[in-house]
């Protein structure tokens, strides 16, 4: 089983990209507290409708719970050096706490 749940805050606004096959994907990073003084930064990918919702409602600083699966992929750079990327493929996104913006808008998740 490959399931992960993370609680963290967005480090910047969501960015929409397109895969080589033309699929839309929202990308963002959350900071997850390791302890009081340290955090780890996790890259998140949200595809299709979930990605569109993320782009519309998630902003820098927003606290969220991400439920998804861990993904590790590799690629070669221009010099032929292999790199590994660890990221989470989001299946669900939940808001934590309240913000004034949340009170004004009805959220679809």
Describe the function of each predicted region.
Residues 1, 14-21, 37, 41, ...:
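Acidic, gly/ser/pro-rich intrinsically disordered tails
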Residues 4-12, 30, 60-71, 90-93:
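OB-fold and OB-like beta-barrel modules that bind single-stranded nucleic acids
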Residues 18-32, 84:
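Short aromatic-glycine-enriched beta-strand elements
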Residues 32-36, 77:
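Short acidic, glycine-rich loop/turn motifs
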Residues 47-83:
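Beta-rich strand-turn-strand
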């Amino acid at each position: 089983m490959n399931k992960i749940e993370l609680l963290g805050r967005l480090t910047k606004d969501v960015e929409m990209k397109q895969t080589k096959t033309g699929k839309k994907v929202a990308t963002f990073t959350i900071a997850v507290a390791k302890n009081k003084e340290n955090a780890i930064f996790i890259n998140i990918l949200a595809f299709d409708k979930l990605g569109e919702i993320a782009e519309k409602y998630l902003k820098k600083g927003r606290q969220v719970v991400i439920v998804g699966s861990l993904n590790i992929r590799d690629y070669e750079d221009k010099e032929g050096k292999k790199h590994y990327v660890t990221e989470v493929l989001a299946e669900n996104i939940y808001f934590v706490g309240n913000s004034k913006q949340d009170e004004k808008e009805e959220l679809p998740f």
